[in-house]
Regions:
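Extracytoplasmic/peripheral linker and loop segments enriched in polar/acidic and small residues
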Residues: 149-150, 316, 352, 402-414, ...
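Long beta-strand-rich cores associated with HINT superfamily self-processing modules
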Residues: 503-529
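Aromatic- and charge-enriched surface segment that lines or borders ligand/interaction sites
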Residues: 77-124, 158, 248, 296-298
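Ligand-site clamp/hinge motif
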Residues: 189-195, 221-267, 282, 393, ...
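N-terminal lobe/hinge region of extracytoplasmic solute-binding protein
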Residues: 32-82, 197-200
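Structural transition elements
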Residues: 326-365, 382-387
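Gly/Pro-rich hinge or "lid" segments in bacterial periplasmic/extracellular proteins
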Residues: 140-146, 150, 154-155, 163-229, ...
Length: 529
């Protein structure tokens, strides 16, 4: 049995508390975000921009510290059974909601049952399928009360899993596993997220939300670690225009930008080198391909041709100014729990001119004459994405494919894709919720809202189902590698780049540490004078 207690992490937390405790005169931080959240109902969220907001408002059983290590949150300790199928959490008795109510085990049970209920329509429900009966509940085959999570008593919560899940603790840091204030949700329904109504249990509570302007939060005085939260007020400002965040950062109006304009990288490296943070990031930038019924894009040879002709080195080095790496797989390099030599597109090392010749041959084989195919390249508003799609349009000309650009508003962009919106080729990105290949490969399973191309492949789904219940981790890794091999052959989505995180962080901000998932909760930060 594996046992973790709060005392085991006390040294790490004490060091953080010491940093956070360096309170300065300035207690308000203004943080740039990629876009506004489409919702503050964490069961309906799906983007990184939304997760940043949720991480400040709520606290899960476990949380990620400044280095993104899993540390105690509402749970002060936990035990894992020898077979890896049972996780038992002991909740701290001083955890409280922002209205002073105690946080109890039933708050987690209520939330987890709600997210699995089909009527909730939670796009992230399937991320919790490792929990016993979760998938059956999400598909309507079983009742929410049958979910493998139990409030043993007010301060003890037990999970039962289908199979050993090496990333389960990391998964519990995700917004899909956060608790809910039952009384407020029951009384207010969908209005529970409104300022003045919303009750949260994290380091901060919601004060106001003005779309396209800012979200304002203030310290939750009932938070169990409030004494070590150094920043009293957080203002999250949306910046779909990354250059606007840069300008306001230089003016001293914003202390942190979560992304930066790649075309101004040389300027920032010269003038803001101490504030510019570029670090490895667990994410893939990719191009889902769909097309209308009868479109040549439905032919995998056409998709393969498009993928072959893309000069990923140029896009990474010139468009993104060496802040990205060329990507030839959906699962990013360096991920945990995978095979030693992961699958990759087999033309990664071929000369680009040779690839263009092969691409033209594939198009001819598919019956696509030169100049006969026009595709629309859609992307969410950002100069970085616009420049990427402009470069791709030029590359497609080399094999006789015409392309037009379609810029879409960012806040509802991914909702449009999740709801099955029509498109030819779009840009998308996926940042790992946990370090496991499953978190990238599940995106293309049948029935998953994140399967933007609505691609269906029975063999692929069967392999992913098999991996989910395979207890031998080596066998599990190979099964998922077999699934990715199918994915890379069919290319319903074209891997393009491997992410790096790019941020501007004021020298006044203390406690910020680069980490692979690029998670930076405000509670770990402080501001120097």
């Amino acid at each position: 049995m594996t046992l973790f207690s709060l005392r085991a992490g006390a040294c790490v937390l004490a060091l953080m508390a010491g940093t956070a405790g360096m309170a300065a005169a300035q207690v308000t931080i203004v943080r740039g975000n990629d876009t506004d959240p489409a919702t503050l109902d964490h069961h309906l969220t799906s983007t990184v921009a939304e997760s940043r907001i949720m991480n400040d408002l709520y606290e899960g059983l476990v949380v990620q510290d400044a280095q993104a290590k899993v540390v105690p949150g509402v749970a002060e300790s936990w035990e894992i059974s020898e077979d890896g199928l049972t996780y038992t959490f002991k909740l701290r008795d001083d955890a409280k909601w922002s209205n002073g109510d105690p946080v109890v085990a039933e708050d987690f049970v209520f939330a987890l049952r709600r997210i699995m209920t089909p009527a909730t329509a939670a796009v992230y429900a399937n991320i919790l399928y490792p929990i016993a009966n979760a998938e059956a509940i999400a598909t309507g085959a079983k009742q929410p009360e049958e979910l493998g999570v139990e409030a043993v008593d007010e301060h003890t919560l037990k999970f039962t899993l289908n199979a050993p899940t090496p990333y389960f603790l990391e998964l519990l840091t995700h917004q899909s596993s956060l608790p809910m204030h039952r009384a407020t949700v029951k009384a207010e329904g969908s209005n529970f997220t409104k300022p003045g109504v919303m009750v949260t249990n994290g380091a901060y509570k919601l004060v106001s939300f003005v779309p396209n302007d800012r979200i304002v939060m203030e310290k939750n005085e009932h938070f169990h670690d409030a004494a070590n939260v150094a920043i009293d007020r957080v203002e999250w400002v949306p910046f779909e225009d990354r250059s606007a965040c840069l300008r306001r950062f230089e003016a001293g109006e914003v202390q942190m930008c979560t992304d930066v304009p790649a075309e101004q990288m040389a300027y920032m490296r010269e003038n803001l080198k101490d504030e510019l943070h570029i670090a490895p990031y667990l994410g893939t930038y990719y191009l889902p391909v769909k097309g209308a019924d009868g479109s040549p894009l439905k032919d995998k040879r056409v998709r393969q041709a498009i993928s072959m002709v893309l000069d990923r080195d140029f896009i990474a080095e010139e468009v993104w100014q060496e802040t990205m790496l060329p990507g030839y797989s959906m699962v990013p390099p360096g991920i945990s729990n995978y095979v030693e030599t992961p699958p990759a597109l087999d033309y990664a090392d071929e000369d680009l001119l040779d690839r263009e010749d092969k691409a033209k041959a594939l198009l001819e084989e598919a019956g696509v004459a030169e100049g006969s195919l026009t595709v629309q390249l859609s992307y969410n508003s950002s100069e970085n994405h616009r420049n990427t799609m402009t470069a791709i349009a030029d590359m497609l000309k080399n094999i006789g494919i015409n392309a037009t650009l379609n810029e879409m508003e960012g806040t509802n962009y991914f909702n449009y894709l999740k709801e099955g919106g029509a498109y030819d080729i779009v840009r998308a990105g996926w940042i790992g919720d946990y370090s496991d290949p499953q978190n990238f490969l599940f995106l293309f399973e049948g029935g998953v809202p994140f399967n933007y191309p609505r691609w269906e492949n029975a063999e692929y789904d069967a392999l992913m189902d098999k991996a989910a219940v395979t207890q031998d981790l080596g066998q599990r890794a190979q099964i998922m590698a077999d699934a990715e091999t199918i994915l890379l052959d069919e290319v319903p989505a074209i891997p393009l780049l491997t992410y790096s995180s790019r941020a501007l962080v004021s020298g006044k901000v203390q406690g910020y540490e680069d980490n692979l998932p690029d998670v930076h909760l405000t509670r770990w930060l402080s501001l120097a004078e």
